[in-house]
A protein has these predicted regions:
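Cytosolic covalent-transfer regions centered on His/Cys nucleophiles
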Residues: 1-183
């Protein structure tokens, strides 16, 4: 849809501020959509109907990153991610985590997504959604924006709920794109 901004009279300062923030949000939305297009593909999203423990899950996801050419050293990457989780957990909110390695860099940036129908316990949280990130050494604006987006996901209860209800990878991608940072 098209965003509409209505005014009855000449704009006041607060109208101009609102309009500017709306334009900023639309630009952010476009940028976020572009980043999601680039980094989160359907074939890298897996819905797990059964219980999984974190180490087993991360190993499986690391192998997929390796098969897709994002990382070359599966074992090194996996152990690095586990170590990070032990010392600096990457929980965002109570249901989501974004594990990534401390020292091991990716050949190219890639993301594996796991949506669990049965939660697992991690640092006192019941986790259901895992975005495993393989990051190149050069951190760019896109990744910073992606982290901002992840932070926003967890603060939108309705949106988060919708994501967690996704039945399969198609539904997950569709729900992922239903975000509006405007709300």
């Amino acid at each position: 849809g098209v965003e509409v901004f209505s005014m009855d009279k000449l704009p006041e300062i607060k109208d101009i501020e609102r309009l500017n923030s709306m334009i900023h949000m639309i630009r952010m939305n476009k940028r976020v959509s572009k980043i999601l297009d680039c980094y989160i593909q359907k074939e890298h999203v897996k819905v797990y109907p059964d219980t999984k423990e974190l180490p087993e899950l991360l190993l499986e996801m690391s192998k997929k990153l390796h098969e897709s050419g994002f990382i070359s050293d599966t074992k090194g990457f996996y152990e690095d991610v586990l170590l990070r989780e032990k010392n600096y957990p990457t929980n965002l909110g109570s249901q989501m985590m974004v594990p990534h390695a401390l020292f091991t860099f990716a050949d190219k940036t890639g993301i594996e997504v796991a949506l669990l129908k049965k939660t697992f316990e991690h640092h006192g949280n019941q986790v259901q959604l895992v975005f495993l990130l393989a990051l190149e050494k050069k951190r760019n604006d896109e990744m910073n924006l992606l982290f901002q987006f992840f932070n926003q996901i967890v603060s939108h209860k309705k949106y988060m709920h919708q994501l967690l209800q996704s039945e399969d990878s198609d539904a997950f991608i569709k729900n992922l794109y239903s975000f509006k940072l405007l709300e």
